[in-house]
Swiss-Prot record:
The active site is at 304. It catalyses: (S)-dihydroorotate + H2O = N-carbamoyl-L-aspartate + H(+). The gene is pyrC. Changing residue 63 to A: Lack of activity. Binds 2 Zn(2+) ions per subunit. One of its GO terms (biological process) is purine nucleobase catabolic process. Zn(2+) 1 binds at residues 59, 61, 151, 304. The lineage of its organism: Bacteria, Bacillati, Bacillota, Bacilli, Bacillales. This is Dihydroorotase. It comes from Bacillus anthracis. It comes from the Bacteria. Keywords: Hydrolase, Metal-binding, Pyrimidine biosynthesis, Zinc. Its cofactor is Zn(2+). Catalyzes the reversible cyclization of carbamoyl aspartate to dihydroorotate. Coiled coil: none annotated.
Length: 428
């Protein structure tokens, strides 16, 4: 099916939002211009809505295989499509871990069979993410590994991390890291700060993250490796990443929507839906993340979509697993709380969710360019809705944002020229 989207708006190559039509033919973007006419195409009048590149998320957890009670590739990618994401990068903390030919081939077969959006799987740095034996990077790359990470646990052995970075650099691949120094975690369930003190909870100190990042940056410099930092959360982390970039070290970084919108002051009670890793930090950390995003220290926004069951989250804040769902709330949360409040522009938000992650990892995505695959998201910037977890397509309903009123909701997502999801009656 070919589609002609009429009367939309998009961000052009100069970074300005302008009026446009967009023609999709044979799965490709055929033309982006005003006043397009075409035969043999279904005309869809988007009536002033935003025509955006499909959103790109480099940090997601789909749980399959091994965690299908939390999420599956099918439910997770449907949720991604509903959130406007057309390309997502799946972390390797599954069971089994994609750490060898057999496991990666199985994962890729599952993705091919079940995914509703483009899914790029990470390969593990170490076997079973145990930190002691390096995986076969060459084989994992051959089988389509997006990059290498032991996400969920930082690689604690510096010699192992250096060896991994050297091998990744030879393959022109990135090493991606969840950064925690295990000896400083303190069995914490929240940030070490006012909230932990008030509620008598063990806290995770900010330096637990920043000291690990500082170590890895120096290792990346020694290995001449592209090093990407997951979900930055502290003022100290922003500082060391900024210093590294100024020194010319190949480091990039991401931040989550929840760390941009919330800090520990916003946690109303010991509610496990506010438990994520890294935890919500202090107000100064929150302000540093915004500053880092604006000055280019932080390159992109990634959801860290981490679904869990209601039963798991009901165990209380100390025992419940870390993580919240992110796909279906990311864009409206960011548009409402950052763009509408004048903290960033709409153009910047689009870049942080599309071209910046794509460019950082060399993906042919993130831009509406003629000849490229038609991965497109239509967004109604005027639509206001209340976040209702019962309507999520994800199996995970675990969100701290239930009841929040937000504007800017995706209404249609096109992947490879085909409609992957659309809101009922949104474009009628």
């Amino acid at each position: 099916m070919n589609y002609l989207f009429k009367n939309g708006r998009y961000m052009n190559e100069e970074g300005k939002i302008v009026a446009t039509d967009l023609l999709v033919q044979d799965g490709k973007i055929a033309k982006v211009a005003e006043n397009i006419t075409a035969d043999n195409a279904e005309v869809i009048d988007v009536n002033g809505k935003l025509i955006a590149p499909g959103l790109v998320d480099v940090h997601v957890h789909l749980r399959e295989p091994g965690g299908e009670h939390k999420e599956t590739i099918e439910t997770g990618t449907l949720a991604a499509a509903k959130g406007g994401f057309t390309t997502i990068c799946a972390m390797p903390n599954t069971r089994p871990v994609p750490d060898c030919r057999e496991h990666m081939e199985d994962l890729q077969n599952r993705i091919k069979e079940k995914a509703h959006v483009n899914v790029l799987p990470y390969g593990a740095i170490t076997v079973r993410q145990a930190g002691s034996e390096m995986t076969d990077f060459e084989t994992l790359k051959e089988l389509g590994a997006f990059a290498f990470t032991d996400d969920g646990v930082g690689v604690q052995d510096a010699s192992m991390m250096l060896a991994a970075m050297k091998r990744a650099a030879k393959l022109n691949m990135a090493v991606v890291a969840h950064c925690e120094e295990n000896t400083l975690i303190n069995k914490g369930c929240v940030h070490e700060g006012k909230f932990s003190e008030k509620h008598g909870l063990n806290g995770i100190p900010s330096v637990c993250e920043s000291v690990h990042i500082a170590r890895d940056i120096l290792l990346a410099e020694a290995a001449d490796c592209h090093y990407h930092v997951c979900h930055v959360s502290t003022k100290g982390s922003v500082r060391v990443i900024r210093d590294a970039k100024r020194a010319g070290i190949k480091v990039t970084a991401e931040v989550t929507p929840h760390h941009l919108v919330l800090c520990e002051d916003d946690i109303p009670s010991a509610d496990p839906n506010f438990k994520m890793n890294p935890p919500l930090r202090g107000k100064e950390d929150h302000e540093a993340l915004i500053e880092g995003l604006l000055d280019g220290t932080i390159d992109m926004i990634a959801t860290d979509h981490a679904p869990h069951t209601a039963e798991e989250k009901a165990q209380g804040i100390e025992r419940a697993p870390f993580g919240i769902t992110g796909f279906e709330t990311a864009f409206p949360l960011l548009y409402t709380n950052l763009v509408k409040k004048g903290i960033i522009t709409l153009e910047q938000l689009i870049q942080f969710l599309t071209e910046k992650p794509a460019d950082t990892f060399g993906l042919e995505a993130g831009r509406l360019k003629e000849g490229r695959t038609a991965d497109i998201t239509i967004i109604d910037l005027e639509q206001e809705e209340e976040i209702d977890p019962t309507t999520f397509l994800s199996k995970g309903k675990n969100t701290p944002f239930a009841g929040w009123k937000c504007q800017g909701w995706p209404v249609m997502t096109i992947v490879g020229g085909k409609i992957a999801w659309q809101k009922e009656s949104a474009l009628v």
